[in-house]
Amino acid sequence: MSTIAQHGTAEHKMPREHFLNAAYTVKSWFLTMDHKRVGLLYLFSICFFFLIGGTFASLIRLELATPEADLMEADQYNVAFSMHGIVMIFFFLIPSIPAVFGNFIMPLMIGAKDVAFPKLNLTSWYLFIFGGSFGVLTTLLGGVDTGWTFYTPFSSTYSNSNVILAGMAAFIAGFSSILTGSVSYTHLRAHET
C-alpha cells in the first residue's frame, strides 16, 4: 500500500467580489465588465426576443387552425409570418450560442479570468439591445411583409415603408454579433505549466 505525499498545497481563496456575490443593483448589471454577467444579460434578452417570436408563431398557428381568416387578414398574416422569421433568426438564433455560451462558458473553459476586451463585450450587448429595439419598433409600426430574407421584389415594390427600419435592426444585430465574435479569448488563455 502506498501513500501519496502532498507537497506545497495551497489554499484556494475565493475572490472578494465575483458575479455571484457582487452588488445586485441595476447599475451594477448594466455597467458590468464581468463576462459571466454579460452572458446572463444576453441570455435574458434573447429569452425576451424568443417570447416575442413565439407570440408571432402562436398567432400564425391560431390562424392556420381553421381554413377561414378568423384571426388575421392576408396582409396581417404575412406581417406575422415575416416578423416571426426576422425575430427568431436575427434576435434569437444567430446570437444565442456565441453570445451566451461564448461569453459565459468559453473563458472558463480555456482558463481565462476574463475576456480580452470587456468594454467591447458590453458594447456588443448594448448594440444588440439597440437593434432589438428597432425590431420591436418595426413591429409596433406595422411590421414588414417581405419575409425574413428581404428579397428585392417583395421589399421594394410590394412592401410597406418599414423595410428600412427592419433592415437596420437586422444590420445592427449582425454588427453586434461581429463584435461579440471579435472578443478574443486566446490572449488571456491560462499558461500551461
Task: Identify the residue ranges that each predicted region occupies.
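Extramembrane terminal tails and long inter-domain/linker segments of multi-pass membrane proteins
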Residues: 1-36, 68-72, 152
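Compositionally biased, intrinsically disordered low-complexity segments enriched
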Residues: 8-9, 37, 86, 193
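Hydrophobic, small-residue-rich membrane helices and short re-entrant helix-turn-helix hairpins
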Residues: 27-40, 111-114, 189
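Helix-boundary and loop/linker segments of multi-pass membrane transporters
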Residues: 30-32, 80-81, 158-160
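Hydrophobic cores of alpha-helical transmembrane segments in multi-pass integral membrane proteins
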Residues: 39-112, 116-150, 162-185
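Conserved small/polar residues in nucleotide/adenosyl-binding loops
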Residues: 186-193
